[in-house]
């Protein structure tokens, strides 16, 4: 059983002056402290190159430390910030690390810590990642204690770069010490998938090719690159959210039942199903790039001055998948993601096969929708008799909206959940090295095709549209049956973002 980090743990955040730390890491630690899941004896040290004082860092992160409802809690904020300090230093020389080592060891000596517990959070760009890992291992590791290292994506740019990264990391950290964070695995509805699937007989029994007609994993954003064009141009939507976040969701949807919730049992099954994915057919995709909005008020992707004028960067993609195993053989699966669309949401759609005809001439499919964000919810579209004397069908839904059902529950943010898991030593919701390898093997040939000299030109779609032209036909070709116009309206739970 993994050792739980509790009293007198030292958490060091590299890249502490950056946006990720300010908007995600520090607020997540505060959330854990506020709810009683971070021991008040914890010492939190921010480390970066920026010349800041302790007070400078505290003032920088303070506006982002709030309650889940957005309200401030000054007393808790001040208590938390008293646990936070800052040290400036270079990333590429020993000097700053040795100074940091002294600070950590003085704290541990003062607290009479025999077995140090040190958690290092690397909120850093790929360009300096390995240098920092090497210096960290050389200067900040202790033989008498336990170290854990949280690393952020991207975990490589393709299979080759991911393999090279792994080869450099392997001599530095054991797999037990390394926590590759994909924040989607910390989202409440994603963490709910295994319990929902395998803890409910009616769902588990229907979760197969005999009953399921089509599967979709959907990601929509209502905004474009908004100043990140230069960065986004080098990655595109597939690397940004599909090879990592959405694939993690899909593996949890399609994996077999693990023998237990033990981290290795769960990750073993994820790798098994990934290996059963057929290679992506280059003709089984739909790609697009957003243009200006219909009214001209929103810019096109190419209007961004940091983007190459002839860029073929994909900002929307729909990809068909096939899984060659007993459970999923023949079931069409679509993963789709896009920027600059009409709304912001992430959801899973499982459409079931129609019931046999005979007593029913034309009855809609059942459909299970799992809303990951925003406003977590589960809907089951089903058929029922319309109240009254007539024997007519009405399509309705069974509705579990979390904000209504669990009003008095604290639903942790993804980073809160995952940092807590790392403190507990629980790897269940982190990416293992072989899992990363198989995922890149699946996507790299497609990326090479799209980015090669003979790669296709993405279709232009207007900023703010519901979907690019051709998506309805693409989904229909992949087994999805649309409701008749006006026959049913899905519950509206997604505010425009």
Swiss-Prot record:
Give the catalytic activity. Answer: D-glucose 6-phosphate + NADP(+) = 6-phospho-D-glucono-1,5-lactone + NADPH + H(+)
**A single Pfam family, by name?**
G6PD_C
Active-site residues (renumbered): 245
Pathway given in the UniProt record = Carbohydrate degradation; pentose phosphate pathway; D-ribulose 5-phosphate from D-glucose 6-phosphate (oxidative stage): step 1/3
Q: Does the keyword NADP apply?
A: yes
Transcription found in the keyword field = no
As one GO molecular function, the record gives: glucose-6-phosphate dehydrogenase activity
GO CC annotations on file: cytosol
EC number per UniProt: 1.1.1.49
Tell me, which GO biological process terms does this entry list?
A: glucose metabolic process; pentose-phosphate shunt, oxidative branch
Q: Which InterPro entries match?
A: G6P_DH, G6P_DH_AS, G6P_DH_C, G6P_DH_NAD-bd, NAD(P)-bd_dom_sf
EC class, as a word, reads: oxidoreductase
Q: Which Gene3D superfamilies match?
A: Dihydrodipicolinate Reductase, domain 2 (3.30.360.10), NAD(P)-binding Rossmann-like Domain (3.40.50.720)
Positions annotated to bind NADP(+) 2: 336, 345, 349, 371, 379-381, 399-401, 466
Tell me which UniProt keywords the record has, alphabetically. Carbohydrate metabolism, Glucose metabolism, NADP, Oxidoreductase
Question: Where do the annotations place NADP(+) 1 binding?
Answer: 15-22, 49, 153
Classification via SUPFAM superfamilies: Glyceraldehyde-3-phosphate dehydrogenase-like, C-terminal domain, NAD(P)-binding Rossmann-fold domains
For the ligand (D-glucose 6-phosphate), the binding residues are: 153, 183-187, 221, 240, 339, 373
PANTHER family referenced in this protein's UniProt entry, alphabetically: GLUCOSE-6-PHOSPHATE 1-DEHYDROGENASE (PTHR23429:SF0), GLUCOSE-6-PHOSPHATE 1-DEHYDROGENASE G6PD (PTHR23429)
Q: What does this protein do?
A: Catalyzes the rate-limiting step of the oxidative pentose-phosphate pathway, which represents a route for the dissimilation of carbohydrates besides glycolysis. The main function of this enzyme is to provide reducing power (NADPH) and pentose phosphates for fatty acid and nucleic acid synthesis.
Can you tell me which family this protein belongs to? Answer: Belongs to the glucose-6-phosphate dehydrogenase family.
Its recorded name reads Glucose-6-phosphate 1-dehydrogenase
- What species is this protein from? Kluyveromyces lactis (strain ATCC 8585 / CBS 2359 / DSM 70799 / NBRC 1267 / NRRL Y-1140 / WM37) (Yeast)
